[in-house]
Amino acid sequence: MKHIVITGTSRGIGFELAQQFANEGHKVLALSRNTKPLEKINHKNITTIAVDLSNNDDLNKVTLFIKKEWKTVDVLINNAGKLVNKPFTDLTTADFEEVYKVNVFAVAELTKLLIPFFKKGSHVVTVSSMGGVQGSMKFPGLAAYSSAKGAVITLSELLAEEYKEQQIAFNILAL
């Protein structure tokens, strides 16, 4: 049995992963602003916490839970994402900040907060995007989103190098 933290669990990939891991017998901490979809399932292996990832005070709820209930984290899946679709010339600094708060800063902050709970063999998977690899040329209107997804690719590569001696793995899934 693993202890798995997943962000962005109200729908889509995060919602499905939470159920799949729980059904396989793993303990899942499901983080989302909207916890109702997973609460309806009422799975004994899923704990939900309402978290706004762009709010550091909310992130502290996660560490408090882990300290009290789990003591360790085997897997972190950074799945939550924020997308603003506008032509580049229409994007504001506030648009970029909004996207980066969820897609980059929250990934970095949550990962940093959970590092003390990782052990040899722990794994961090961050969901990126092909837009982060190929850029906005193939994804017009997604300059803020794609550049943020590119940033977490680089961040994950750097963390993989920094934590290789502790045998904590960092990977990206670009969809």
Which residues does each PLM region occupy?
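Conserved glycine-rich cofactor-binding loop
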Residues: 10-11
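Conserved Rossmann-fold SDR core element
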Residues: 74, 153, 163-175
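Conserved NAD(P)H cofactor-binding loop of Rossmann-fold oxidoreductase domains
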Residues: 79-84
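Substrate-binding pocket helix/loop in short-chain dehydrogenase/reductase
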Residues: 87-88, 95-97
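Active-site helix of classical SDR
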Residues: 111, 145-148, 156
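Alpha-helical segment proximal to the catalytic Tyr-Lys
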Residues: 116, 161-162
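Residue(s) in the substrate-gating loop at a strand-loop-helix junction
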Residues: 129
